[in-house]
């Protein structure tokens, strides 16, 4: 595969056409994990650990890690002893993570290639925001989850302290694209990141949409002052 530095810089639009989003992630795949660590100032490792804890996985459980990218989160979840499969609609991302010893499947969150009630738990980290129809995706996640199973969504959200929120938005819209230019193979993708985070629902709004999609007992926990929120819900029996 050609090195991604040779790709034309490209970003998806906020209508999130699947082919555009997949192509954009194909273009950042080679340096994706490094770029995430840099732009999050190392917080990405803590966020993955916190997501695994929120999943409360047990050995032998079956877990779907959706929008898994290169599988770095899947490896984190597998530390629990659960059987974890990574799924993503960017074949470039899956190829970049092919060295990781976890099963990987190409799949669209809006039409998951799995049977009903296949998984004890589903996680999606920083991916629901990139789906054209997040509500349909959450219903698909419900379909493939066993009764009593759970969904954890890790996603960029709304900082809870107003002053910090202002500073964060300044970083997101102005500084982050400049940082991305130094490390990413497709810095324009991080302009899309900033714009999509700004347009994303806040914590309460996302919880309401989870409930409307059929998830029960929905709660959330803020990480890093609300830069990221973990939402968890359950499928009733």
Curated annotation (Swiss-Prot):
One of this protein's Pfam families, by short name?
Answer: Ubie_methyltran
UniProt entry tagged with the keyword Methyltransferase: yes
Q: Enumerate the UniProt keywords alphabetically.
A: Menaquinone biosynthesis, Methyltransferase, S-adenosyl-L-methionine, Transferase
- SUPFAM superfamilies xref list: S-adenosyl-L-methionine-dependent methyltransferases (SSF53335)
Residues reported to bind S-adenosyl-L-methionine: 70, 88, 108-109, 125
Annotated InterPro entries: SAM-dependent_MTases_sf (IPR029063), UbiE/COQ5_MeTrFase (IPR004033), UbiE/COQ5_MeTrFase_CS (IPR023576)
Q: In which pathway does it act?
A: Quinol/quinone metabolism; menaquinone biosynthesis; menaquinol from 1,4-dihydroxy-2-naphthoate: step 2/2
Q: Does this UniProt record's set of keywords contain Transcription regulation?
A: no
Catalysed reactions listed for this entry: a 2-demethylmenaquinol + S-adenosyl-L-methionine = a menaquinol + S-adenosyl-L-homocysteine + H(+)
Enzyme Commission identifier(s): 2.1.1.163
What Gene Ontology molecular-function terms does this entry list? demethylmenaquinone methyltransferase activity
Could you provide one GO biological process annotation from this protein's UniProt record? Answer: menaquinone biosynthetic process
Enzyme class, first EC level, given as a word: transferase
| Family of this protein | Belongs to the class I-like SAM-binding methyltransferase superfamily. MenG/UbiE family.
What biological function has been recorded for the protein in this entry?
A: Methyltransferase required for the conversion of demethylmenaquinol (DMKH2) to menaquinol (MKH2).
Instruction: Name the HAMAP family for this protein.
Output: MenG_UbiE_methyltr (MF_01813)
Q: What is this protein called?
A: Demethylmenaquinone methyltransferase
- Organism of provenance: Nocardia farcinica (strain IFM 10152)
């Amino acid at each position: 595969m050609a090195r991604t530095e040779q790709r034309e810089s490209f970003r998806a639009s906020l209508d999130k056409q699947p082919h555009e989003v997949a192509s954009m992630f194909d273009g950042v795949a080679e340096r994706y994990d490094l770029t995430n660590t840099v732009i999050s100032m190392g917080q990405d490792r803590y966020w993955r650990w916190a997501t695994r804890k929120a999943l409360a996985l047990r050995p032998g459980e079956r877990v779907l890690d959706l929008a898994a990218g290169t599988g770095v989160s899947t490896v984190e979840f597998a530390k629990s002893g659960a059987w974890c499969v990574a799924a993503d609609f960017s074949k470039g991302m899956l190829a970049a993570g092919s060295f990781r010893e976890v099963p990987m499947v190409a799949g669209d969150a809006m039409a998951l290639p799995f049977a009903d009630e296949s998984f004890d738990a589903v996680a999606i980290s920083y991916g629901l925001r990139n789906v054209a129809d997040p509500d349909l995706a959450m219903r698909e996640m419900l379909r493939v989850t066993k009764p009593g199973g759970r969904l954890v969504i890790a996603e960029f959200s709304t900082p809870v302290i107003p002053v910090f929120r202002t500073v964060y938005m300044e970083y997101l819209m102005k500084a982050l694209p400049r940082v991305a230019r130094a490390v990413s193979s497709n810095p324009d993708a991080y302009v899309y990141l900033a714009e999509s985070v700004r347009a994303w629902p806040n914590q309460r709004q996302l919880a309401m949409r989870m409930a409307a999609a059929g998830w029960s007992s929905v709660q959330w926990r803020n990480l890093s002052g609300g830069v990221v929120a973990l939402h968890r819900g359950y499928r009733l029996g």
